[in-house]
């Protein structure tokens, strides 16, 4: 039995969960999210009001989908109650970020500024010219836009310049030794 999949997902007060067949919809103080659960997996409510995810049998595919489905449903509940935030930072001389309206404008050593528009449900916040955060209720969207931003200028293994997640350790390489 999946150790993650068998745990019920607690539903906090103020969160409304609707289950219609394979579709799970969660409405909370921060917004509404929905998920289409894979076919053999069954999602239901138990007596205490928690969400329970079960599988019909122990086939390999069903076992792998069991824990995944439970985690995705738990992410919906956490997203509409607390939301998700990814903090990022920029290293490098002349590298900086600014908020223009709702867009992020990066100066990353290219001949032009790079502008990133937030997708629906995502907000940007700039704390300093080298630190910013990506926030939203959908964990997948927050992670995806953070990865797209990081890809604009990946951290350099020799000098460490680039966009990175806060606290991310970059493997540094030793440069060539001079004669």
UniProtKB/Swiss-Prot annotation:
UniProt-listed PROSITE patterns: RIBOSOMAL_L6_1
GO-annotated biological processes: cytoplasmic translation
GO CC annotations, alphabetized: cytosolic large ribosomal subunit
Source taxon at top rank: Bacteria
GO molecular function: rRNA binding; structural constituent of ribosome
Keyword Ribonucleoprotein in record: yes
Pfam families, per database record: Ribosomal_L6
Alphabetical list of InterPro entries matching this protein: Ribosomal_uL6-like (IPR000702), Ribosomal_uL6-like_a/b-dom_sf (IPR036789), Ribosomal_uL6_a/b-dom (IPR020040), Ribosomal_uL6_bac-type (IPR019906), Ribosomal_uL6_CS (IPR002358)
Entry keyword annotation includes Ribosomal protein: yes
Keyword annotations from UniProtKB, A to Z: Ribonucleoprotein, Ribosomal protein, RNA-binding, rRNA-binding
Subunit comment: Part of the 50S ribosomal subunit.
Family, per entry: Belongs to the universal ribosomal protein uL6 family.
Biological role stated in the UniProt entry: This protein binds to the 23S rRNA, and is important in its secondary structure. It is located near the subunit interface in the base of the L7/L12 stalk, and near the tRNA binding site of the peptidyltransferase center.
Protein name per its UniProtKB record: Large ribosomal subunit protein uL6
């Amino acid at each position: 039995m999946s150790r993650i999949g068998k745990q019920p997902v607690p539903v906090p007060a103020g969160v409304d969960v609707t289950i219609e067949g394979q579709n799970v919809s969660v409405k909370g103080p921060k917004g509404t999210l929905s998920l289409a659960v894979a076919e053999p997996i069954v999602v239901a409510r138990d007596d205490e009001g928690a969400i329970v995810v079960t599988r019909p049998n122990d086939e390999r595919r069903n076992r792998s989908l069991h824990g995944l489905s439970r985690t995705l449903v738990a992410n919906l509940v956490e997203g509409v109650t607390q939301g998700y935030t990814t903090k990022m930072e920029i290293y490098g001389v002349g590298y900086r970020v600014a908020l223009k309206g709702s867009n992020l404008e990066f100066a990353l050593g290219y001949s032009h500024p790079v502008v990133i528009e937030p997708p629906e449900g995502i907000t940007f916040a700039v704390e300093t010219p080298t630190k910013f955060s990506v926030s939203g209720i959908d964990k997948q969207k927050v992670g995806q836009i953070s990865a797209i931003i990081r890809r604009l200028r990946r951290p350099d293994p020799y000098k460490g310049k680039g966009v990175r997640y806060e606290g991310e350790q970059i493997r540094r390489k030793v440069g060539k030794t001079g004669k």
